[in-house]
């Protein structure tokens, strides 16, 4: 996740919004979510997007009183007590350099350093890097070299993070389109799933995918996960009709119409549970209270910090993997609002945890 601009809601939404307002008041209060944390799930969770190499995430461990000096810096956060419910992590790459760095990290770390978690990465170029990382034969060969290296077979899960993002501040779409099309071809070439980033570019994204399918007629189409979904209800329906997977993040704990579109997708039950996953997108996609369990685990160490520093650290950014439990609970809340309205059997936190973990295990070959 890089940047996000709001988009308008379809007119049909407002009738729906009026109907559910009395029940959900647009956003379930965070206090209601926190009540669920008193009995957290007994199931293991998978964070399908945690940017372990991001400096702002790594720096969160600078305040920790816990001794992890013998652990490589990007992996220290996985040893924090607040991540104890996580069993596996996908740490996606956004550039050729980051792809190389993450592969090197994961090839050379021990199971103990990983805190016995299963960690995989992706190989690719993010839309944000599409101009800086020029599409040249040499750069494509670098990606192919990583993908052909047998030492990476158990580490690389997908091609990506790739896609299109027409938000303000992103490179011109001419750069994005070239890289996206080339990476779609790589997915067909190597038989790997696609880790898709799409913001405000729904139609062009589908057009590129459809054209790739035509170019590779007769080949099996790669599986696709639309990560950190922030699109509309109608767009989600189309993604689901195509059989894509989808992950939700702390975006559903934010206020606003855009976030309610995603909550509506959950309430209306249009995402099959076997294709629904959860993520933090840390250090991005923070929300109010997202680091509470992190600070609680630090105890007196955090309390002893100067008040200004505590206040700054309690801001929504940077997000940490510790918020995954809250994302799970908020997802469960929204699903159950819809199930209750339809007089259907509601889903427990453990059931949803098991379902999202199974979906991630199947998709990423964990």
Describe each region flagged by the PLM.
Residues 4-5, 9, 16, 23-366:
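Mid-domain alpha/beta scaffold segments of enzyme catalytic cores
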């Amino acid at each position: 996740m890089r940047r996000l601009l709001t988009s308008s809601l379809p007119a049909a939404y407002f009738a729906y919004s009026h109907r559910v307002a009395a029940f959900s008041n647009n956003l379930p209060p965070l206090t209601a979510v926190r009540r669920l944390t008193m009995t957290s799930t007994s199931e293991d969770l998978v964070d399908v997007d945690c940017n372990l190499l991001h400096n702002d995430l790594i720096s969160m461990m600078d305040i920790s009183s816990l001794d992890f000096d013998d652990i490589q810096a990007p992996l220290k956060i996985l040893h924090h007590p607040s991540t104890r419910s996580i069993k596996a992590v996908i740490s996606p790459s956004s550039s050729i350099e980051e792809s190389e760095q993450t592969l090197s990290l994961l090839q050379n770390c021990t199971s103990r350093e990983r805190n016995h978690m299963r960690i995989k990465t992706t190989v690719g170029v993010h839309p944000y890097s599409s101009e800086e990382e020029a599409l040249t034969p040499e750069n494509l060969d670098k990606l192919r070299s990583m993908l052909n290296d047998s030492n990476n077979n158990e580490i690389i899960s997908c091609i990506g993070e790739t896609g299109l993002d027409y938000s303000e501040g992103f490179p011109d779409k001419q750069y994005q389109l070239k890289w996206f099309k080339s990476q779609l071809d790589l997915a067909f070439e190597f038989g790997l799933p696609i880790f898709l980033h799409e913001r405000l570019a729904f139609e062009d994204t589908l057009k590129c995918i459809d054209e790739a399918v035509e170019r590779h007629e007769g080949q099996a189409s790669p599986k696709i996960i639309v990560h950190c979904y922030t699109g509309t209800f109608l767009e989600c329906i189309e993604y689901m009709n195509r059989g894509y997977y989808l992950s939700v993040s702390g975006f559903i704990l934010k206020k606003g119409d855009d976030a309610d579109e995603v909550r509506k997708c959950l309430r209306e039950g249009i995402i099959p549970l076997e294709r629904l996953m959860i993520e933090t997108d840390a250090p991005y996609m923070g929300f109010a209270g997202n680091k509470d369990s992190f600070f609680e685990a630090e105890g007196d160490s955090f309390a002893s910090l100067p008040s200004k520093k505590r206040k700054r650290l309690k801001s929504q950014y940077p997000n940490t993997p510790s918020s995954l439990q809250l994302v799970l609970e908020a997802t469960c809340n929204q699903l159950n609002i819809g199930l209750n309205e339809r007089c259907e059997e509601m889903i427990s936190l453990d059931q949803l945890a098991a379902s999202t973990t199974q979906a991630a295990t199947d998709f990423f070959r964990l």
